[in-house]
Amino acid sequence: MVFKKLLGALGVGGPSVDTVLSNPSTYPGAPLTGQVNVVGGTQDADVEHITLGLVTRMEVESGGNDYSAVADFFRLTVSGPMRLAAGQQLSIPFRIDMPWETPITTVYGQNLRGMVMGVRTEVAIARAVDKGDLDPVHVHPLPIQQKILDAFAQLGFRFKSADIEHGQIYGVHQTLPFYQEIEFYPPQQYAHGINEVELTFVTSPQAVEVVLEFDKRGGLFTQGHDTYGRYTVSHHDADTTDWRQVVDGWVRQALDKRKSMPGFGAPAGYGQPAYGAPGYPPPGYGQQPGYGHHGHYRGHGRGHHGGMGGMAMGVAGGLAAGYVAGEAFDEIGDAFEGGEE
């Protein structure tokens, strides 16, 4: 789908921009390609730059207040200064290499409820900046991520919601200032001890850190509390491992009152950091997505983990550069929901 918008900041007769994605479906770590088509207005114009940005919605806590904001988490300048003649037509090709930690937005060919992501086009002319062009992007799971999601479904877990939290997970190497949480309701065989499970993938070219947070039920004389698990899984093991058994082991480890070693129930080596190993593309890298097939603490943006605030690296106050809230968030939300302009 293409979104067109006259550069309103420049008035009637200004240049127009049309960003076209070759394929809006992609994977973490995979390329997203397309072209930016620019048409000059009724007068010559001096273009300062044309920049593309990956944007998504995230939840933020600042000063005890929770709110949604827009994260512009990857930027690519496709054109520097140039003279755009009246009526001139330009087509500028681009390639965005999706960050490995890019959140998943599409599972089993369906949009993941709560997730919003797109490419926003920014054009600066004569010190006026327009950010009106926006295209949705559909990020599918990598094979290893899909296998783990399949395992949760096979065990009877029901999807609840997904969101993106601003902050860092203690002890996990992150390159982005946020992480995704995919929440599940437990099936009957686990419901006696767990209210819900939050799943986070922190992906690198070598492996995936799987971070689990279990909201455990309280007993007659005990209060409920959270239990955490962190496991390192290899892209190479996507098709050679019984992931249903592995995930069941992770869940039962959380239910076990005894302290267990990291990686319990997983193949040998899981639970150990994999960073620094030689890089390689994951299985399926470069293929087109097919619809319809198949010891940590969090630096949360929400306040229900206050007891761990000293260990976490969260929001110290306000948002980092590149994040905007309020009207800008509303405009981007409207663009996703409203279709072509």
What are these model-predicted stretches?
Residues 293-341:
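Short, low-complexity, glycine-enriched hydrophobic/amphipathic alpha-helices that associate
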Residues 1-291, 310-324:
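C-terminal beta-sandwich interaction modules and adjacent acidic
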